[in-house]
Amino acid sequence: REAEANGYVSLEAKQAAGEKIQPGDKVYAVGMKKIMALFLVGQEPLEKGMNILGAHIDSPRMDVKQNPLYESTDLAFLDTHYYGGIKKYQWTTTPLAIHGVVAKKDGAVVNVTVGEDESDPIFCVTDLLVHLSADQMKKTLAEGVTGENLRVLLGSRPLTDDEGGDRVKFAVMCLLHEKYGITEEDFLSAELTMVPAGRAREVGFDRSLIAAYGHDDRVCAY
């Protein structure tokens, strides 16, 4: 929308209309709804060079694996793998939100965002209480919390009318199916990510700084 408001037109639409690219044209192309390229066509031939400005907005996060949901010690968890350079110890007991899309078996795509609204639940990676973590606290920061420990707590309440195993896991799946119509198999075609929940806030009495998720590396796009 902002590109079009600044005079850029879709390259695909221009080609479909049989229009040729002319010097001075502003065109854009989108790939898989994830990347965007904008071109300001110059006057000189390409052999004389071009200016390229690149920026990315992907940020360190925890991506949900394809077969992520499991139950352990009467708790339901999501298995994740971290993306980007994260300090893993900073992600424990931090309120997390889940963002992404799920492509269902019928082809429908469901957008999922939970944890950002005040009425939403949040999620977290669990950690040991301080008086139970003597061994952990002897380790280095890099060793105290490992990537394998970055599992996200989803729930603890079991199905009451089921005497089988994994009752907490199935209770969570019932909630997901009720709200989004998704099944466990749909995780195979999902792109879901866990990020710190909460809006950007100003820092300091003078409000001179900003605290928010994603400075690395959305600031370069800004």
Predicted region positions:
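N-terminal hydrophobic/helix-forming segments and targeting peptides
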Residues: 1-222
